[in-house]
A protein has these predicted regions:
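N-terminal leader segment of winged-helix/HTH proteins
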Residues: 1-2
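Short, contiguous alpha-helical
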Residues: 5-9, 16, 24-69, 110-161
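A structural signal for long alpha-helical coiled-coils and helix-turn connectors
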Residues: 23, 97-101, 138
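Acidic/histidine-rich alpha-helical segments that form the ligand environment
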Residues: 71-107, 114-129
Length: 161
């Protein structure tokens, strides 16, 4: 697997780790001007789905994700609904991500005039941005912050263990 999809996989694992122990009540609390955690989950899922499932196939973003796209109004979806979108987006995009090579990363989508490698880096950064936001909201709600990033025994390919 190419290093960029591996980096996104690590980003997803950290995103998931910041959701551990979250209740529906806490996930739906909104501390303005931020969105609530459940909206953020669905918002990040929207990007994963769009970038790596729908757009490479030449389709518009799945309608279930559109309420959480860039610029969409704030809402407070149930945690389970947001998590279902997140799990589905990750599962459905894994096939593309696991097979992505230099040629696939160079492909330009018809919906966004950047290549998929650039969108992948954008998605990694976006996921980390919202991971930090979720961590901040959790702390404001009285939760303990997640410990420093877990690399899950990952090392850059080519480096000796």
């Amino acid at each position: 697997m190419h290093t960029l999809p591996q980096t996104l996989e690590l980003s997803r694992r950290e995103f998931d780790r910041n959701l551990t122990g979250l209740t529906d009540e806490d996930a739906r609390k909104r501390i303005e001007p931020m969105n609530c955690i459940s909206w953020i989950i669905a918002h990040v899922a929207n990007q994963h789905r769009s970038f790596f499932v729908d757009w490479p196939a030449g389709r518009e973003t799945d309608a279930r994700y559109k309420p959480y796209g860039y610029g969409a109004p704030a809402s407070q979806p149930p945690l389970e609904e947001a998590l279902a979108l997140w799990r589905d987006a990750c599962r459905d995009s894994d096939a593309w991500l696991q097979s992505a090579d230099e040629a696939a990363l160079a492909q330009v989508t018809p919906f966004f005039q950047e290549n998929l490698g650039t969108l992948l880096v954008r998605c990694i950064s976006h996921t980390w941005c919202h991971t930090g936001e979720i961590s901040s909201i959790r702390q404001l709600l009285g939760h303990r912050a997640a410990q420093f990033v877990d690399m899950y025994d990952w090392q850059y390919p080519g480096m000796s263990a």
